[in-house]
């Protein structure tokens, strides 16, 4: 069979197969064109999930008749001329409009700002139907109908209308985050589904619009520079995490990307702070010389290739970890919100209050006795947390008492320990509930990690070695890494078949559950690649040791111990979450407490 030149229409349809995969792909290309035209207002309307109708209107620079005719031809563009090494626009190939026109019914109405009138061009199945004058406002309106009517086989690969509409919504969100100075409106068949007013330079305000106020309340600002690359954005605190990676947004020179290198760097930065199966929330913007990044490596321009990927990864990991360390003990606010939603009033409306020993109905002659802490400050008996009975006559001071010094700390002053596991502390504007085991586990881990890096991890010799019985293959694995474990202060040796003797443990752990620790370490080492050694996993091993050497649930603490724990949390990086990524404390504001009692 002889080789022959393909028709222009078929060439465009082939290109459309790569560039226009679904309605969301068309929406992305049209929004990019609007942004490149300098638009400050972009409206997107859809019907049938974008398959029946996709309309993008903008107030950009507009086009005249000559521009319109060229715009629907392949590789005609105003954005580049001779080189791909200085791309400063979102689009640059000149493929989007001809590709869309080859598989759909396309019409474009446009008018330049300095022109008295506009023009309209229509393309169907790759053929220009007409080009004529038309009434139009300054800017451009692109209307795509019956997407893939010319290639019906493609329709079989599309998802439901709801799924396709959801994909368009996600595209609009990403563009809105990248361009806060632009107003975006997305409407469906019968209603406006999204509206993001312009926020100017207020990037966090735009993120609150798109990602919700919870992200704004739990975000840490990023601002770092390494050589010629700048990183800005916001990263959520580790305890503010999600069940998938859909809430990770990355932008390179303003271009939304889903680059594997960037997403991998985000995971690496949070590796020790969130549990397996959970994903951080982050918005990263990387700015660099266009010559240092290749954006022409993917048909949809969703991937990029950096000239120095190691530098970019190091910048991301370092910036996020530094920000998390800077905010130290901060935890997500969502825990308190969840707690508030779970609260119910003590007595439902219109219900009869149960008769109790303290109710007015059964104790009308009984003198009023205030609850402990109202009439008289209690003297806590730590072991049982028993409180003396308050005096019958409440003693109220006409002037509010000065706040105790401890209450002025971020995590407040310890007031009680409940269920031998949770510390209740009073702050200046609310209260904090701390999980003592999770908090101490994080503190121990950070201390071990610091000592490990400084090569000053001391060990304590056990008076009587602990003998742990485990399977022979686990013994072999542990002994293979005995030298590396000794760096963490854990000295082990063989004690006959199927047994390990623990001679020394890290001094900072105090009393250690050696049996549980050895068994868990054996399981973890079996799960890892034993041939690679533990050098890259020492911090994970330290986290395991910290868990087994922390204050256990059920241990009663003295008030001074509780306050000491709170003070140490305030100065320890990452103390807002334990080594497994769970929160170590929940804060409840006074305004939230008042709302529970209907005071607000």
From Swiss-Prot:
Cellular component, GO annotation: mismatch repair complex
Family per similarity comment: Belongs to the DNA mismatch repair MutL/HexB family.
Superkingdom of source: Bacteria
UniProt feature, compositional bias: Polar residues: 349-367
Organism, as annotated: Rhizobium johnstonii (strain DSM 114642 / LMG 32736 / 3841) (Rhizobium leguminosarum bv. viciae)
CDD domains per the UniProt record, alphabetical: HATPase_MutL-MLH-PMS-like (cd16926), MutL_Trans (cd00782)
Key words, A-Z: DNA damage, DNA repair
Descriptive protein name: DNA mismatch repair protein MutL
InterPro entries: DNA_mismatch_repair_CS, DNA_mismatch_repair_MutL, DNA_mismatch_S5_2-like, HATPase_C_sf, MutL/Mlh/PMS, MutL/Mlh/Pms-like, MutL_C, MutL_C_dimsub
Region annotation Disordered: where it falls in the sequence: 327-405
Gene Ontology biological process terms from the UniProt entry: mismatch repair
Function text: This protein is involved in the repair of mismatches in DNA. It is required for dam-dependent methyl-directed DNA mismatch repair. May act as a 'molecular matchmaker', a protein that promotes the formation of a stable complex between two or more DNA-binding proteins in an ATP-dependent manner without itself being part of a final effector complex.
